[in-house]
């Protein structure tokens, strides 16, 4: 199965108060050109679709255009939220999008079920794990103490019923233990880093 993986689009980003939207439109066009050339079975967008939890209208329009173009190309699309994304913003019309094979996992809301695609070699299970934070998952794991992002991710992954005999892809936007955050991560993230 041919996959195209992208992440950290940060649509709507401003650099030194200058909008990068025109540059981002160019990048979206390049992504679409790659899709036209490579014809992937699925496009995986692994978080930080937007640069801010409350994106401006122009950023939302660019994502809308990208989704329309992806739907026209008939590839399956799987999107998860990242720490910069608002789950509420990404979840808008997600059930409607599924009719166009666009699957969006904006927030952890209980055990994750896979999305299964098939190719000439059989089925592939895709597990869409949105960005998880202790505050967003703690209520689902009352018997566990979840103190940090790593424990949140471990709890969520521990609930997945992954069949290791099957081809499996887990799409995530994790917080990496031991990593460092730059100023823009701390300032623009929906959750503190």
Question: Where is each model-derived feature located?
Answer:
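N-terminal active-site segment of His-dependent metallophosphoesterases
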Residues: 1-68, 72
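Residues at the starts of beta-strands that form the adenosine-phosphate
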Residues: 2, 41, 76, 123-125, ...
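Context-gated lysine
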Residues: 2, 13, 25, 74, ...
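Active-site neighborhood of divalent metal-dependent phosphoester/pyrophosphate hydrolases
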Residues: 8, 12, 40-58, 74-88, ...
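Metal-dependent catalytic neighborhoods of phosphoester/phosphodiester hydrolases
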Residues: 14-16, 47-66, 81-101, 106, ...
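His/Asp/Glu-rich metal-coordinating catalytic cores
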Residues: 85-193
């Amino acid at each position: 199965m041919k996959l195209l993986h992208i992440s950290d689009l940060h649509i709507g980003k401003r650099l030194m108060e200058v909008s990068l939207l025109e540059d981002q439109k160019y990048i979206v066009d390049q992504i679409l050109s790659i899709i036209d050339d490579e014809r992937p079975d699925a496009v995986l967008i692994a978080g930080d679709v937007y640069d801010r939890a409350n994106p401006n209208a122009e950023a939302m329009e660019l994502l809308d255009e990208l989704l329309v173009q992806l739907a026209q190309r008939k590839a399956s699309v799987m999107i998860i939220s990242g720490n910069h994304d608002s789950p509420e913003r990404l979840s808008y019309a997600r059930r409607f999008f599924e009719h166009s094979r666009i699957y969006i996992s904006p927030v952890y809301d209980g055990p994750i079920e896979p999305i299964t695609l098939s190719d000439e070699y059989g089925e592939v299970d895709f597990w869409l794990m949105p960005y998880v934070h202790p505050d967003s998952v703690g209520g689902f794991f009352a018997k566990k103490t979840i103190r940090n992002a790593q424990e949140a991710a471990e709890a969520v992954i521990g609930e997945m019923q992954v069949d290791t005999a099957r081809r499996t892809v887990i799409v995530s936007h994790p917080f990496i233990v031991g990593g460092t955050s730059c100023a823009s991560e701390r300032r623009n993230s929906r959750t503190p880093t």
